[in-house]
A protein has these predicted regions:
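Structural motif corresponding to alpha-helix initiation and N-cap regions
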Residues: 13, 43-46, 68-72, 118
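Acyl-group handling in specialized metabolite and lipid biosynthesis
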Residues: 203-216
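N-terminal beta-loop-helix "entrance" segment that forms/cooperates
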Residues: 34-54
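An anion-binding loop in the catalytic cleft
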Residues: 214-306
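A residue-level signal for conserved active-site and pocket-lining positions in enzyme catalytic cores
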Residues: 7, 30, 53, 83, ...
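N-terminal Rossmann-like dinucleotide-binding module
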Residues: 1-40
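Internal alpha/beta domain cores that form substrate/cofactor-binding pockets in large enzymes
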Residues: 2-4, 28-30, 59-78, 83, ...
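Donor/substrate-binding cores of folate-linked one-carbon enzymes
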Residues: 82-201, 208
Length: 306
């Protein structure tokens, strides 16, 4: 089975690693995002997918423009059955969707048609969902609008954050990708159109999303903490200073006070009263300082927080 793979982040690399290690698949080429300069220093950052491709000596393409004539010619010279896409990061043009001998297959981390778009994992955590999943779909020109091949579901637990949920969804995708590709290759599966009337969408996460307002409900804030754990993180503004939050949890103590204010501060944490419930911050970071515990903050910055 000949495959052209497209992906960029670490979980995509795990899927590629699995396909590469399986003798049933012949990876004819890999498309990934161009290398990027590191913000600090002179190092160049290459994607996980790029590193794995080099490990297996796969032909790697890192186009800045998917419609570049030279790139198109390179792909047209490759014969492949499936284009497998896992979080590549760019819209796939129509010509590439029609390039595989069979179909283009996308691995999407939601139960489509829910959460079409760039941040389905974060969206499910932000909304406090109890269920997520992996949708294998035939790619189309529309945003995650293609026909559904198969859906596999996964329970979301309270300890899930963006990183751990993505890991579990990636494992679920790897567990089932053989079955999906085998059925498609043998033409033994019926694809189903999505119900567009039930579609919901999620946008790209922004750096500004990280700033939390403690006037919100406590469970909403906790869901943001889970969703933004990898990036952009969570922070709050106190006395015009942006303070990063590294660890927080719900307080089960019944504390009174005005929403958005610190109602208790000791070595166990900084307690913020919210619209409903109380949040305890146990690890934080002030600008240009190292990460510290609430006990250290109590000893060094007590006057700042009270």
């Amino acid at each position: 089975m000949n495959i052209l793979f497209a992906g960029t982040p670490d979980p995509s690399g795990e899927i590629l690693e699995y396909l590469a290690s399986n003798s049933a698949y012949n990876i004819k080429g890999v498309i990934t995002q161009p290398d990027k300069p590191q913000k600090r220093g002179n190092k160049i950052l290459e994607s996980s997918v790029s590193k794995i491709s080099l490990k297996y000596n796969f032909p790697v393409f890192k186009p800045t423009n998917l419609n570049d004539p030279e790139f198109i010619k390179d792909i047209e010279d490759i014969e492949f059955d499936f284009l497998v896409v896992a979080a590549y990061g760019k819209i796939i043009p129509n010509w590439l969707l029609h390039a595989p001998g069979k179909i283009p297959v996308n691995v999407h981390y939601s139960i489509l048609p829910s959460y079409r778009g760039a941040s389905p994992i974060q969206a499910s955590l932000l909304n406090g969902d109890n269920l997520s999943g992996v949708t294998f779909m035939e790619m189309s020109e529309g945003l995650d609008e293609g026909k559904i091949i198969k859906i596999f579901t996964l329970d979301i637990i309270k300890t899930h954050n963006k990183v751990s949920l993505e890991k579990d969804l990636c494992d679920l995708a790897i567990k089932n990708i053989d079955n999906v590709l085998d059925l498609l290759f043998a033409d033994k599966i019926l694809l189903n159109a999505q119900d567009d009337t039930k579609a919901s969408y999620c946008s790209k996460i922004k750096k500004s999303d990280s700033v939390v307002d403690f006037v919100e409900k406590a469970d909403v804030i906790i869901n943001k903490y889970r969703a933004y754990s990898e990036w952009p993180g969570l922070a709050f503004i106190h006395k015009d200073v942006l303070v990063k939050i590294h660890d927080m949890h719900l307080c089960h103590e019944d504390l009174s006070g005005m929403p958005g204010t610190i109602v208790k501060f000791d070595k166990t944490g900084i307690y913020f009263k919210t619209k409903l419930g109380t949040i305890v911050i146990t690890h934080l970071q002030l600008p240009n300082k190292n990460k510290i515990s609430s006990a250290d903050a109590y000893n060094a910055y007590r006057e700042f927080f009270v």
